[in-house]
Each structure stands twice: as structure tokens, then as C-alpha cells.
Amino acid sequence: MAKTKHPPAPDRVAAFQTGISAETRAAAYLMAKGYRILARRFKTPCGEIDIVAQRRQLIAFVEVKARARLDDAAYAVTPRQQQRIIAAAEAWLMANPDHATFELRFDAVLVAPKRLPQHLPAAFDASP
């Protein structure tokens, strides 16, 4: 017997749309700062990277957080999420070996309504 697919709950749809909107704002903000967007929503079995951006010889793996207040967004990248992002970054580098010699960094962009996004370079690092 085939499973019936149920539509997603309205709050999940709203959260998804908020995330897409925040990622679009973050990407535009990074481009205005001179970054080139190499990938968005890069998915792997071990995690997802919201944005992969390049500026000169730097690759930034960017986590985007949307919250009602920027202060709340700043605390939204948990250690577990950091590990998943690091694992996804390793997968991205294996799929894009021409960037393996670049400087690597893990950034965050915080997005709140009616505010400019806030870019946090080196929001966390890959050291254990």
C-alpha cells in the first residue's frame, strides 16, 4: 500500500520561506562586500552549508541565521551544528578539489527584520 504524502505544516512552510529569504539577503550582502557565491544550500548526508562564498584566495562556508533579533541569532549555531557544517565543508572540498589550497573559514551571517545583515567572519573554527 502506498503511503499518502501529507502537506507540510504551515509553521514548517513559514520557517522554510524565512530561511530562503534570509539566505537570499545574506548572499546579496556578501556579494556587495566583494564575495562571489559558489554554492547555496549545499547538501550532504552529514550536513548542509547555507552559502559557500569566495573572496580572492579565501573560501567562506557561511551559516545563515534568521531571528527576530540579531542578539538571538548570534547564539543559534550550536556545537553540533558546527560539526555538521564542518563535515559538509569537507565534502564540498572533496567535490571541488581546485579550491583545496585556498584559505578556509567558517562564517555566520545574522539576519533580522528591518536590519542590515551582520557578517561574523570566523564565527567558529574547525579545530577540535
Curated annotation (Swiss-Prot):
Signal peptide interval: none
* Cited InterPro entries: Restrct_endonuc-II-like, tRNA_endonuc-like_dom_sf, UPF0102_YraN-like
Check the record and name the SUPFAM superfamilies matching this protein. Answer: Restriction endonuclease-like
* Originating organism: Rhodopseudomonas palustris (strain HaA2)
Q: Name one GO molecular function term.
A: nucleic acid binding
Q: What is this protein called?
A: UPF0102 protein RPB_0420
Q: Which family does it belong to?
A: Belongs to the UPF0102 family.
Q: What superkingdom heads the lineage?
A: Bacteria
Q: What lineage does the source organism belong to?
A: Bacteria, Pseudomonadati, Pseudomonadota, Alphaproteobacteria, Hyphomicrobiales
Question: Which Pfam families did the record assign?
Answer: UPF0102
